[in-house]
Amino acid sequence: MGIRVLTLSDVETPAVYSSRIRSRFGNTDLVISCGDLPSYYLEYVISMLNLRLYYVNGNHVQRPESEDNAERYEHPWGAINLHRKVVYDREHDLLLAGIEGSLRYNDGPHQYTQGEMWRMVLGLAPQLASNRVKYGRYLDVFVTHASAAGIQDDIDKAHQGIDAFRWLLATFNPRYYLHGHMHHYNPLKPNLSQFGNTTVVNTYGYREIEI
């Protein structure tokens, strides 16, 4: 049996933020958030399921009324931030990496140009190459908020995909690519697709996958 992963992004859902979360998701092994969710929501999931939670921030960050709590709102207690990191989860024998945010379209937080995204992605490359030597593979799961260029993205500036993400997928062939940001209300738009050997998942709301 594979690793059962609960993926989250963008909107709070009653199925997750519920007193019945343990009965609904009690067989989950790991939680991954792709951004734009408040810290209290992620902390609730961590405390109720007692599981490790990896995350990246989205481009919408809820600001606290008091600056004393600012750090907590961007970095939920007990969660592991994947932004610009390559992480080996020893318990699940899983290699993860992540990049936060979206393409820059206004002066909001966690927005970057294509060039800035390239620099961050290329910064992951040495450790991904090292993974190949140590573990026999580059990467299992790539986690972002925005989508990759030409893969479940859109034409407007805010939702254009990231060129560097597409390059990473083509170069390092992770088994799974998880992203948020794309609010798909149209059932005809796919939330699950394939790019080469990589399964691409839009995690809008929540999805349960097995890795």
Features from the language model and the residues they span:
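N-terminal active-site segment of His-dependent metallophosphoesterases
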Residues: 1-48, 130, 134-138
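Conserved catalytic scaffold of divalent metal-dependent phosphoesterases
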Residues: 7-16, 57, 61, 69-159
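Binuclear metal-dependent phosphoesterase catalytic core
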Residues: 2, 19, 86-91, 168-172, ...
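Metal-dependent catalytic neighborhoods of phosphoester/phosphodiester hydrolases
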Residues: 18-21, 37, 41-50, 62-77, ...
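Short, well-ordered coil/turn elements that cap or connect secondary structure elements
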Residues: 26, 48-50, 74-77, 82, ...
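Active-site neighborhood of phospho(di)ester-bond hydrolases with catalytic His/Asp-centered motifs
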Residues: 7-9, 30-36, 54-59, 82-83, ...
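A short, gly/pro- and small-residue-rich
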Residues: 49-58, 162-165
